[in-house]
Design a protein with these regions (language model features):
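Peripheral, non-transmembrane regulatory/ligand-interaction domains of membrane transport proteins
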Residues: 1-122, 128-131, 135-142
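Hydrophobic alpha-helical transmembrane segments and their immediately adjacent juxtamembrane loops
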Residues: 134-193
């Protein structure tokens, strides 16, 4: 699929913050390069919340790209239905499934982090925490909507293909019957009785 998700670990230690991932995490680059205004790594909880924010934001950006790609494939499918476009839609649907799974897991992790007694949430973090919750919830809802729309679109195109096949079968049946009539007539007159 064009998009995929990877696990990410963030370790808060007294000496600093460590992030571990199986692949490139380009969404973290603004945090690591210091391009996020007002970010302090002194409070590890703030950094963790910013990571969640960046994750949700990256998913929303990816969702916009997926929606644009789906729209392009939809326009192609309106002209002619080929396997290439249908497979492209399937790839996008897989990506949306990965997004939804990852976002829901992130929401669950965020809820669990709030209950960890050893993490000391500063008052400043509470507003950011609420913002991150809203951003994650919005991303989850938008991905779910996009997934439903894509599923409905694929069902509609499947119905179109089925209708087209039915029309072709009707024509072929009619042609077969028409071609069978001369054979039937010749068979009747050609019998030796």
């Amino acid at each position: 699929p064009p998009w995929r998700t990877l696990p990410l670990s963030v370790l808060l230690t007294p000496q600093g913050i460590v992030t571990l991932s199986q692949g490139t995490t380009s969404f973290l680059q603004p945090l690591l390069d210091g391009h996020v205004q007002g970010l302090s790594t002194v409070r590890g909880t703030e950094f963790v919340l910013r990571v969640f924010w960046q994750l949700a934001d990256a998913c929303l950006r990816g969702l916009r790209e997926i929606n644009a790609g789906v729209e392009g494939l939809e326009n192609e499918l309106k002209r002619s239905i080929r396997n290439k476009e249908v497979l492209g839609l399937l790839d996008f649907q897989k990506s949306l499934t990965f997004f939804a799974t990852g976002l829901k897991a992130n929401e669950l992790v965020l809820e669990r982090l709030q209950r960890v007694p050893t993490l000391h949430w500063a008052d400043q973090d509470q507003e950011l925490l609420d913002d991150v919750r809203v951003e994650l919830r919005q991303a989850i809802e938008m991905v779910d909507i996009a997934d439903r729309v894509l599923s409905d679109m694929m069902d509609a195109f499947a119905s179109i293909v089925s209708n087209n096949l039915n029309s072709v079968m009707k024509v072929l049946t009619s042609v077969t019957i028409i071609l069978a009539v001369p054979t039937l007539i010749a068979s009747v007159y050609g019998m030796n009785v």
